[in-house]
Amino acid sequence: AHKNVSVDLVAAVHIGEKSYYEELNKQFSGYDALLYELVAPEGTRVPKGGAKSDHPVSRLQTGMKNLLDLDFQLDHVDYQSENFVHADMSPASFSKSMNERGESIWALVFRMLGQSLAEQNKGEKSLDAELVLALFDKNRALALKRVLAEQFEDLEGMMSAFNGPDGSTLITERNKRALEVLGNEIGSGKKRLAIFYGAGHMPDMARRLMADFKLKPSSERWVTAWDLHERAAKGRSKAAAPKEGKSKREKATAAGNS
């Protein structure tokens, strides 16, 4: 085990309340190293206020944040902080891994769609009907958030659809890269670290920390990412949200430490 080392897994919600990102910025300042995800050339730094992009995914995220009356992670998290460390694949290595695995973005999307349809068939309520009703609700943003939050409850199941039996570049290979960087940071003497990655990465990440770094879970904390109360729409209050509207932070410490 790595003596006196602690690693927090900070599960990112990419579109959330501005107050959520402000709280994360406060917490992030206390780490020796904060490892973050971004498929980009090694060492890339996100400019303050986020990088502007016309990429279809970026446009989709912008549309979602406007529809839900929320904010975007890259616009508010301070990636210029000195303790931030890029810990993800480069576009070239990401593409190479997908080719070697015989993967494609569309194949992953269809696999995810199949999982979603299977889950819908299990339930009594129609997601399509719920979404239509939410779109015509007098408080559309809040109604949509509540519908979507229910879908996030089975996040691990959704991610297993992406991963497949042999893992995937999107989750498995990127996690391996993040933990490679983690090992380098620990080797350089860092003791208090965090990995800030999408929530879907965390089940696999936690297993690898326990198996490869001999760490063990010690505690968890929830931070409000989406406020699902009625009053949240009027001034975005900081009231506690139901569990499904929160982002989870898990702490792992070296075996034997408190």
Give a label for each model feature.
Residues 1-173, 184, 218-234:
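Structured, acidic catalytic/metal-binding patches in enzyme active sites
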